[in-house]
């Protein structure tokens, strides 16, 4: 079975990716399987730039095909913030709770109808030989004024999906993966892998 490196140490993200790619003939490895793997600086200006950088570095270092995602929250009332800085919105190595608190603070005076936002995700697939592919997904919602739900990670407890009547953190994993930005991008990746494989 072909090994595929998922360039992340985020267990929540890895769990979502594994659930969606289930059934494909790949053994998934994470960066936890490569303890000496260096930290890759996410210095791109777009989700695509960051995803391609992480996947290509992982493919080159491990000698295996690799996929990486870069995703984040884009809030209309904040001119697209936190964007590519979503994971470190309140500072380097910030916790989900700290990032959520900063977001709520910045939206404190913004009325509900103006709290529109989107989760965006770009997945990059790179081979050690230099082939590169990208797949993108998006999900629209509204930022609530307090967290709801205990599932998921990141901004999930604040991101309300109207058609589901729930936050991302309130949805079971299977339901979340069916509608999420990452789920949509991974569905495109899965289709690609099913038809073309990694090369």
Swiss-Prot record:
The Gene Ontology terms for molecular function here are: dITP diphosphatase activity; ITP diphosphatase activity; metal ion binding; nucleoside triphosphate diphosphatase activity; nucleotide binding; ribonucleoside triphosphate phosphatase activity; XTP diphosphatase activity
Ligand binding (substrate) = 8-13, 71, 153-156, 176, 181-182
Q: Which cofactor does it need?
A: Mg(2+)
Residue positions binding Mg(2+):
41, 70
Q: Which GO terms describe its cellular component?
A: cytoplasm; cytosol
Q: Which residues does the Swiss-Prot or TrEMBL record annotate as the active site? A: 70
EC number in record: 3.6.1.66
Q: Does the keyword S-adenosyl-L-methionine apply?
A: no
**Cofactor comment text:** Binds 1 Mg(2+) ion per subunit.
Report which reactions are catalysed by this protein: XTP + H2O = XMP + diphosphate + H(+); dITP + H2O = dIMP + diphosphate + H(+); ITP + H2O = IMP + diphosphate + H(+)
Q: Does the keyword Hydrolase apply?
A: yes
Q: Its GO biological process terms? A: nucleoside triphosphate catabolic process; nucleotide metabolic process; purine nucleoside triphosphate catabolic process
Tell me which domain of life the UniProt entry assigns to the organism this sequence originates from. Bacteria
What are the entry keywords? Hydrolase, Magnesium, Metal-binding, Nucleotide metabolism, Nucleotide-binding
Q: Which family does it belong to?
A: Belongs to the HAM1 NTPase family.
Per UniProt, subunit arrangement is: Homodimer.
Known role: Pyrophosphatase that catalyzes the hydrolysis of nucleoside triphosphates to their monophosphate derivatives, with a high preference for the non-canonical purine nucleotides XTP (xanthosine triphosphate), dITP (deoxyinosine triphosphate) and ITP. Seems to function as a house-cleaning enzyme that removes non-canonical purine nucleotides from the nucleotide pool, thus preventing their incorporation into DNA/RNA and avoiding chromosomal lesions.
Q: Which named protein is this?
A: dITP/XTP pyrophosphatase
Q: Can you name the source organism?
A: Geobacter sulfurreducens (strain ATCC 51573 / DSM 12127 / PCA)
